[in-house]
Amino acid sequence: MKLLAALLLVTGLTISPAQAALAAPDIPVANVQAHLNELQRIANANGGNRAHGRPGHKASVDYVKAKLDAAGYQTRIQTFTNSGATGYNLIADWPFGDASQVIMAGGHLDSVTRGPGINDNGSGSAGLLEVALTVARQNVRPAKHLRFGWWGAEELGLVGSTFYVNSLTSAQKSVIKAYVNFDMTGSPNPGYFVYSSSGQPSGSLAIEDLLEAGFAAKGVPTELTSVGGRSDHAAFARAGIPTGGTFSGAEVRKTAAQAQKWGGQANVAFDRCYHQACDTSGNINVTSLDRHTDVIAYALYSLIGA
Ligand code: DPN
Ligand code: CA
Ligand code: ZN
């Protein structure tokens, strides 16, 4: 418990959530799964995918946006053009907290054309959405300003996130104090990876430590991984913004030592359906989805000073 909350408790004062330091919430994984089922339904209704330039991507954006709008977020859709098609980033601001200290969290909402992209990256997208909705439900009044991004055209080379960062003035970049990325969190043969801060902007080590502490609080061992230019934090890192993230693994195979530590199958890919048609709502390990999503909440509540 944070000191303020403890003091108020012992002095017998009644306190509202807006005044107390909130413990990080336990995000109900069933709510995250419900979002994934919607993304699967959207893919089914739109030719089997949610890819850039295809109607399933825009329908995904509209689904997430409607939930956020109803919860009180200030949302906007930023458009860009790539490969002759319009792309979409969805940006959502929780309209409270010090605007000169912005904490950002994001992930990509587009899939590859081969399949519905439920683990890659419905999982991170749905987890971020449910954490955002939890902030609204709890009516959190954070010290810092919270902003979410759901990026388009990641699968074509980090296009949407790069477009967003390039669209910011240097003043707008300098107020962003952290960016945390969630791309693949429900891998069927899961790992519990935290992005390595090595080679990342100064300030990234604190984010790495925080994400590790979030898993440690749940008794889950972690490993560091160097994601490099393989996901959307890269554009933020290039702009000098401290970054981090979590990841449950893609095409690489789980080692025997990792299977000892995390369970699952040794010598099998973390996600055998990576970028395949079989990346459906059946391609999700619910325990992994639950743990990674709870860590999103743990890290964000701490970073924003909730
Ligand atoms: N960027 C992911 C993809 O969309 O294909 C895969 C990935 C995520 C790879 C994180 C490494 C680390
Ligand atoms: Ca949970
Ligand atoms: Zn991908």
What are these model-derived regions, one by one?
Residues 105, 109-158, 296:
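Alpha-helical metal-binding/catalytic segments enriched in His/Glu/Asp
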Residues 96, 131-145, 169, 301-302, ...:
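Flexible, small-residue-rich helix->loop connector segments that border functional cores
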Residues 151-254:
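Metal-dependent peptidase/peptidase-like ectodomains
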Residues 22-55, 110, 184-187, 270-277:
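N-terminal capping segment at the start of a domain
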Residues 1-21:
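Secretory targeting and sorting signals
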